[in-house]
From Swiss-Prot:
Record text on subunit structure and interactions: Self-associates. Associates with microtubules and forms a fibrillar structure partially linked to the microtubule network. Interacts via its C-terminus with PLK1. Interacts with ODF1. Interacts with MARK4; the interaction is required for localization of ODF2 to centrioles. Interacts with TSSK4. Interacts with AKNA. Interacts with QRICH2. Interacts with CFAP58. Interacts with BBOF1. Interacts with CCDC38. Interacts with CCDC42.
Domain of life, source organism: Eukaryota
Protein name per the record: Outer dense fiber protein 2
Modified residues (Phosphothreonine): T87, T105, T226
PANTHER family per UniProt: OUTER DENSE FIBER OF SPERM TAILS 2, OUTER DENSE FIBER PROTEIN 2
Length: 680
């Protein structure tokens, strides 16, 4: 505080509408003429401090405790007899004191209301996300329970499938046994007929042999009688010898015929047994070949079924992969929509904040324009007053004219700055329009994406319905197959029981034939060696058939597993599609509010453009006023001295200010360290 006088600081308490005019003595050092001082603005009642746009590094003057200072840039022209002080308005705030009545809180309230609405929307969205997460957790738990239940059902189905396979195996064995029994039955019927014929033939041969035996026995009896007679008579005549020789010849003849018939009978029996054995072997061979052909056809049919099932499994796997890819794309689209919504909300908030800031700046510019007009009016009034006092202050008027010229130059510079600011505002408005166009394009893109997503959802729903219908048809087919298998099983068990009873009856009827079969077993053993080879081949074919059946059972189990997995995947897809649909509906509900917000922002931008045009017109008016002032300043010595007011009001009511030349003292710049106008 070296440049100040030793006088203590002055505190002045005045009313709000009282004008204040302060004159300070000239500083002793000439270097102080180029220094810049700051005005102190009180912040009491309905007044607030306004931020300055230009800051100059100067020494801080003494301030009373508990107060803050604001440093506007001021210009001062000083000469030993006179001093003129001009404080140009800043580029952002053109008033030294701004009242609370000049500020409107409607935009702030609307901005706060919008922010509160967006916060509420965000809270509701977060709550919805939390609810969705809890639902997802519950669905996961339900899925785990369903998986456990399905695994239990799967085990039960595997057991049932194993039992069905065993029953099918038993059914096949029973079927083969029944076919064998039928074949044996047919064979026994034919054998009975053949045996009946052979029996008749044998009976005729046996009758012939008995007749030959009876004739031979008669001949032997006759021979015994003749021999007995000869023993009793002990004399043999020629007739006796002839009869004896004749009977001997007849006996030999009868014995030879009996031997021939016996031999032929044995040959017939042997041929009959050989025929029976060969026929039995041929029938067994035919049955084996028939079984082999049936096994080959069954194997081919199972291979075709396996190929068809493999194709169906591949198609189902491809469909599952396609559904997974579609679900993945749907989840990615939902994530991108979430990020786009957050980005749009952030942009809307930033644009609303920027719009509110622009509105405040525009209002401040309006206030500064009004203040400038008031200053110009005050200057004009002072010019009128100074014209009356021009005779006494000619010399000070010349200096004032110079200062006015410099001030006019400063005002021109300020007008140029305003032009630059207006150009910047135009650029900002153009940028805002471009951002609006980009928002419109984004909104159109979002609407287009919404339509695409709706189409995809419709396609997915159709696909899911088709898959559900296919699943229902497959389930119905499997149910029908199971019912038919159960019916066949019951029918075959009934047939098996009937065949068993018939077999027992046939066994009882075949008891007399077992003796003959025992005789044939000796000859059958010779053929067992050849039969073993066929049995080995049959075992190989049986093992192959068993392998094919096991493979078919495995394929059936795999198909059942695939069906179950398809059911699970379909359920999951339905749940994910419902969740994605809900998310898309919520997002669409949020996005439907964007056109209203965009319309509001467009209306605000249009108002800003209108206000900017009004400011341009005001700027033109101000330039016209400045040109008029210049033309008046060219009048030279005819214009009196005038001074710019330092505040909103001047001290002393309506009395005109006393010129410095009349008082006989030098004027200085208004120093808040020596005289302060405070409002409490």
């Amino acid at each position: 505080m070296k440049d100040r006088s030793s006088t203590p600081p002055l505190h002045v308490h005045v009313d709000e509408n009282t004008p204040v005019h302060v004159h300070i003595k000239k500083l002793p050092k000439p270097s102080a003429t180029s220094s810049q001082k700051s005005h102190k603005r009180g912040m009491k009642g309905d007044t607030v401090n306004v931020r300055r746009s230009v800051r100059v590094k100067t020494k801080v003057p003494w301030m009373p405790p508990g107060k803050s200072s604001a440093r506007p840039v001021g210009c001062k022209w000083e000469n030993p007899p006179h001093c003129l002080e001009i404080t140009p308005p800043s580029s952002e705030k053109l008033v030294s004191v701004m009242r609370l009545s000049d500020l409107s809180t409607e935009d702030d309230d609307s901005g706060h209301c919008k922010m509160n609405r967006y916060d509420k929307k965000i809270d509701s969205l977060m709550n919805a996300v939390g609810c969705l997460k809890s639902e997802v957790k519950m669905q996961k738990g339900e899925r785990q329970m369903a998986k456990r239940f399905l695994e239990e059902r799967k085990e039960e189905l595997e057991e049932v499938a194993h039992e069905l396979a065993e029953t099918e195996h038993e059914n096949t064995v029973l079927r083969h046994n029944i076919e064998r029994m039928k074949e044996e039955k047919d064979f026994t019927i034919l054998q009975k007929k053949h045996l009946q014929q052979e029996k008749e033939c044998l009976m005729s041969k046996l009758v012939e042999a008995e007749m030959d035996g009876a004739a031979a026995a008669k001949q032997v009896m006759a021979l015994k009688d003749t021999i007995g007679k000869l023993k009793t008579e002990k004399q043999m005549t020629c007739t006796d010898i002839n009869t004896l020789t004749r009977q001997k010849e007849l006996l030999l003849q009868k014995l030879s015929t009996f031997g021939e018939t016996n031999r032929t009978l044995r040959d017939l029996l042997r041929e009959q047994h050989c025929k029976e054995d060969s026929e039995r072997l041929m029938e067994q061979q035919g049955a084996l070949l028939k079984r082999l052909a049936e096994a080959d056809s069954e194997k081919a049919r199972l291979l075709l079924l396996l190929r068809d099932k493999d194709k169906e499994v591949e198609e189902l796997l491809q469909e599952i992969q396609c559904e997974k890819a579609q679900a993945k794309t749907a989840s990615e689209l939902s994530k991108s929509m979430e990020s786009m919504r957050g980005h749009l909300q952030a942009q809307l908030r930033s644009k609303e904040a920027e719009n509110s800031r622009l509105c405040m700046q525009i209002k401040n510019l309006e206030r500064s324009g009004n203040q400038h007009k008031a200053e110009v009016e005050a200057i004009m009034e002072q010019l009128k007053e100074l014209k009356q006092k021009g005779d006494r202050d000619k010399e000070s008027l010349k200096k004032a004219i110079r200062a006015q010229k410099e001030r006019a130059e400063k005002s021109e510079e300020y007008a140029e700055q305003l032009h630059v600011q207006l150009a910047d505002k135009d650029l900002y408005v153009a940028e805002a329009l471009s951002t609006l166009e980009s928002w419109r394009s984004r909104y159109n893109q979002v609407v287009k994406d919404k339509g695409d997503l709706e189409l995809e959802i419709i396609v997915l729903n159709d696909r899911v319905t088709d898959l559900v219908n296919q699943q229902q048809t497959l389930e119905e087919k499997m149910r029908e197959d199971r019912d038919s298998l159960v019916e066949r099983l019951h029918r075959q068990t009934a047939e098996y029981s009937a065949f068993k009873l018939e077999n027992e009856r046939l066994k009882a009827s075949f008891a007399p034939m077992e003796d003959k079969l025992n005789q044939a077993h000796l000859e059958v053993q010779q053929l067992k060696a050849s039969v073993k080879n066929y049995e080995g081949m049959i075992d190989n074919y049986k093992s192959q058939v068993m392998k094919t059946r096991l493979e078919a059972d495995e394929v059936a189990a795999q198909l059942e597993r695939c069906d179950k997995e398809n059911k699970i995947l379909k359920d999951e897809m339905n749940k994910e599609i419902e969740a994605a649909r809900r998310q898309f509906q919520s997002q669409l509900a949020d996005l439907q509010q964007l056109p209203d917000i965009l319309k509001i922002t467009e209306a605000k931008l249009a108002e800003c453009q209108d206000q900017l045009q009004g400011y341009e017109r005001k700027n033109i008016d101000l330039t016209a006023i400045i040109s008029d002032l210049r033309s008046r300043e060219t009048g030279g010595d005819q214009c009196p001295e005038y001074r710019v007011p330092t505040g909103d009001c001047q001290e002393g009511g309506g009395n005109p200010p006393v010129p410095a030349a009349a008082r006989g003292e030098n004027t200085g710049m208004w120093d808040p360290g020596k005289a302060v106008g405070e409002r409490h």
